[in-house]
Amino acid sequence: LRSTLDFLLYNWLQAESLSARERFADHSRETFDAVLDTCERIAREKYAPFNRTVDVQEPHFDGERVTLPQATKDAYDAYAASGMLSAAQDYDIGGMQLPYTVDAAANAFFAVASISISSSLLSVGNANLLMVHGTDLQKKVFALNEFSGRFSGTMCLSEPQAGSSLSDVATRAVPDEAPSVAADGSVPWDQDPLGPRYRLTGNKMWISSGEHDLSENIVHLVLAKIPGPDGKLVPGTRGISLFIVPKKLVDTEGNLTGVRNDVALAGLNHKLGWRGTTNTLLNFGEGKYPVEGRAGAVGYLVGQPGKGLACMFHMMNEARIGIGMAATMLGLAGYYASLDYAKNRPQGRPVGQGGKDAAQPQVRIIEHADVKRMLLAQKSYGEGALALNLFCARLVDEQHTGAPEAADEARLLLEVRTPIAKSWPSEFCLEAN
């Protein structure tokens, strides 16, 4: 994998040239390689040896808490300590100001070692959304703690009755008229320092990493509708708003208050893939964990009412590239396993002019023409998908740091290529395996 990444980064995408830009001026190939070396080592030590463990030991829910293998916690802590959660962020918030191109390449090592053991892309995407659309205090309290690994994040869109049809979202959010749970009781709901405060009720399905004990807190980003003056929900997507709903309530310094929010795990979904990560059904506001004696999950509005979907698309587009990379690395992991097996498995005799010579030792199956064909097909699908995803990452850097005309062109290209970066590897890297 390393030689392939080096070729794509330096010979094709010219990642070194990014250091000529002001944002990346402190970087060089030396620093890029140091990041790749570190990630390769952590993936080799903390991820790869436990890939089978997290596949056969699914998360377990006993009705009260979720249990995960210790290897998952160890990998989470090692990843957080590496600084990769905030690698692309500004120096002043603890980031490395690393180009997204290099960031994506470095994360490939974790995905190929064990995609199942981590869902850090959700925490990063969650925090990135808040850095763009959140208030200064929301960034400080929630996003920065996600970048450090102290908190983790989710995105809660789908619902049991609606699937992925967001226009049919039925989760409700009403202003929290009760005394503030984060202040001295005198702050009106719409003046809470963490954002306008609402109470949410509803159910969210297929939420990855929706419940675990890997981090101190879980920051749920939840799509919900605020009822109109008549008490009815606005039909379609126009009425959808976005809310921060922490598993545990916090104060304005990000400290846990000791109050559990009214978010309850109803059950875990069993999956064919990504089995080391919880996939959950979450109940918001059912009253299992009442706050201030009342049912309803406390949530803080992000952005403007009715504009939640536009905010969430910031995270969804980023997640699409991440999911595409995950599928890509599953395909490449399969290829590397196939290649290793083909190099070591003897089968059949060499064929000469007179046919097979039974006196000769068996040959490795990689020497069979049809096996070569299949291996080359796997390699083409996997490395082609990797090139596509890294090209999209390079476009992200161009959009953010390029000249105006180049940045606009990169934005347009991303609009076209981002859905492909998710869908093509998801189909053809499965075909490769």
Where are each of the predicted segments found?
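Amphipathic, small/basic residue-rich leader segments at the start of a protein or domain
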Residues: L1-I117, L137, V141, A182-D184, ...
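Active-site-adjacent bridging/hinge elements
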Residues: N11-A20, T72-G83, Y100-D103, P196-L200, ...
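Glycine- and acidic
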Residues: A20-F32, V56-F61, M84-D92, N107-A113, ...
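Internal maturation/activation junctions in enzymes
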Residues: P59, L122-S123, G134-P188, P196, ...
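A short core secondary-structure module
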Residues: G195-R260
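A glycine-rich, basic-preceded beta-loop-alpha segment at the flavin cofactor/substrate interface
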Residues: L249-A266, K271, T278-A319, L339-I366
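Extended amphipathic alpha-helical segments enriched in small hydrophobics
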Residues: N317-G402
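Charged, glycine-rich active-site and insertion segments that engage polyanionic ligands
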Residues: L414-N433
